[in-house]
C-alpha cells in the first residue's frame, strides 16, 4: 500500500434491539467515510450468526438484547469468531455497571455508556473508537470462562484473602507496587491479583475505563482478588496488602508520606494517567518501587515507567503474545527501560520477587 493509499472502510455489525437507537447508531457511524455498517442484529442469536457469516472488523454490542443477552452473544463471538467488540451499555449505576465490566473481562475491547442525549462530541468519540479498535488482533476466549469468573463463589472462597484490617505500611520495611493497564486490562489485572495473596505491600492501579464503570470495576476486582480492593480516597495512608483503584477521571498519585493523592485536573490526555502514577512512585518510593505496564492502546505509562527505572525501581512489561493490545508495553520497550518483559502468567511471581528484594530485612 502506498503512503497515500487509504484503508478500506471499517466493516461494522450493529447489535441493538431498539429500532430508534439502532437507526441513530447506524446514521452516526456511517457519517464517517471510513466506517460502513454491513449488518444489523436485534437479538443475541442473530448477532452470533451475523458475525460468523459477515466477519466484520468491529461489532457494536448492546448488552440488553433478547435471546440470551449481550453477554451470551459476546461469549459466543469471542469463542468462535473473535472480533473487536465495543459495548454500548445503558447500565451506568453503581449496582448495574457490573455487566459492562464483565463484558470487558470477557473480551470486549471498550465499553461506553449510552448517552441520554447524542452530542456531537459523543458521536465523534464513538467513531474514533471504532476506527481505533478495527485493527486490534483479538484472542479467542474459552466460552463462558472469563466473563463469568466473578460469579463462582465456591472458587473464590477457596482463595486466601488478606484481612480487611490491612496494617499501615512501614516505609522502612516495604515497597510500592504500581500497575497500569488499558484495553484488555481487567482480565489481565484479575490474573495478576490472584497470584499476589502473599504480597505485603500496597498496590496502586490505573485502569483506563469510562468513569461510569469505575465503581463496577472495583466491585468486580474485589470478588476475584485475594487482597482487599478499594476505590482510592484522597488522603488515605497506604496499607500493606491493599489494592487501590484510581477513581474515574481522576489521577492517582502518592505523596512523600505514602498517602493517596487524587488530582482531577486534566494534566494529560488520559485521566487517570499511568504516567502520573508512575512518576509519583518514582519520586517518593524510588528504588522501593515496582512498576508494571500491561496491555493497552497508546503510550500512556511509558514516560512514567522510565522515571521509575531511573530512580532504581523494578520495571515490568507484559509481552506481546499475551497482550490484547501491545501499544503501552511496546512504548515502554522502545525506550529501553523495561527490566523484565514477561507473559501475563509470570508477572505475579515477578512482582512478589521484586517486592521481596526491595524490602529490607529487619535487623
Model-derived regions: residue spans:
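Conserved acid/base catalytic micro-environments in cytosolic active-site loops
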Residues: 1-11, 18-30, 34, 40, ...
